[in-house]
Amino acid sequence: MRTPSFGSISRRRSRIGSGHVFPAAVLVLILLCCFASRGQDDAPVSAADVPPILKIGAQAPDFNLMGVDGKMHSLADYASSKVLVVIFNCDHCPIASMYEKRIKQLTSDYQGRGVAVVVIMGNDPKAIHLSEKGHTDLGDTYPEMKLRYEYRHLNYPYLYDGDTQAVALKYGPTATPHAFVFDQQRILRYEGRIDNNAREELATKHETRDAVDSLLAGKPVAVQDTPAVGCSTKWAYKEAGAKAEVAEGDEKPVTLEMATAGQLTALRKNVGTDKLLLVNFWATWCGPCIEEFPELQKMVRMYAKRQVEIVTVSINNPDEKKFVVKFLEEQHAINRNLLFSGSDSADAVKAFGTNWTGGVPYTILIGMNGEVLYRTQGDMNALDVRRALLKNLPDDRYIGQHAYWNSVF
């Protein structure tokens, strides 16, 4: 008997018993609430509603989805291929990202051999907690998919199913990545993992490739299903948890400390710590500072469990503290926030050093040995900052992400 991967739960449906009679107004209200909460009436609203995995021997469900190329893709577009490989993957999951290169290689290796590889992003982007983005630069929205595709020079059709999850509901992927291999008649012959280890150098079994090779050779697939191990599919019902996490963070206290020139010098050295240090200098009178601040706060929550401290330093005058506090509270800035205690901002510039000319915003990433890893004078490009962070963060929970962010493919 198959051992299901974590997150795969058979669908159950509840019914209102025939003996219950509801006033028409109440019934209409219930229906309106249901449709308002989700546009698709089959979308899971709880873990009990998660669809089952498509069964071996089933026909490939049709799809009509927008790709990152701006075109619609359907099952019929791949009718000429002898074998169709459909893989559910995403951007935010560290395990999923570690498979991008292998999926790209799979696509390349079988090009011209009658094999089509199609990748579908089936997560609900709004169901992803900020804390689940601690190893990524991006979420799972359509625009973010395009950014990842271009950044990694990917070569396969990458399709978006995040708004309704209509296709994911038909296939029932439990995790990312989750592969489905269909024969020429589009009968499912294999579903499960791509191989047996997220770290490519440790993978010894390659079930997806084996299934493709067997079908091309006209042979039965020996291993028909395996557990798909990775980040669980983010079904719509998980939106509530993502919102609750934000609300919980918003309730944390906002603090502001006064910092002397000497304290800024000590901050710059970043000694006696096992964390990277990201510092953003700003002021309430600086338009670009105000504009980019929400992105900075998003990073605070994304990387809260990683080895990095994010600090903001306001160069407002000390008697403007109340304005600084007000803004920080509006932004729910729960990280460490400083206000330079001197009345001459040039003293702050001199104390911190690092060739800062004094203009704000000024953002700098400092390593664990005090080395400057990244800096930008002027408007911050949040994507560049995140990638600089990820490239320099050590493997603090498991092995593989440091190599991923420092690889080129």
PLM segments and residue spans:
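N-terminal secretory signal peptides that target proteins for export/translocation
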Residues: 1-18
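Bacterial N-terminal signal peptides
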Residues: 23-34
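A short beta-strand-turn-helix
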Residues: 63-84, 255-277, 297-303
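Short pre-active-site segment immediately N-terminal to redox-active cysteine/selenocysteine motifs
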Residues: 82-84, 89-92, 275-277, 281-285, ...
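Conserved redox-active cysteine motifs that mediate thiol-disulfide chemistry
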Residues: 90-102, 281-298
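Thiol-based oxidoreductase modules, predominantly thioredoxin-like and allied folds used
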Residues: 114-139, 154-164, 307-321, 333-345
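Short, internal strand/loop/helix patches
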Residues: 137-182, 188-189, 325-360, 368
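Thiol-/selenol-based redox modules, centered on thioredoxin-like
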Residues: 183-256, 359-409
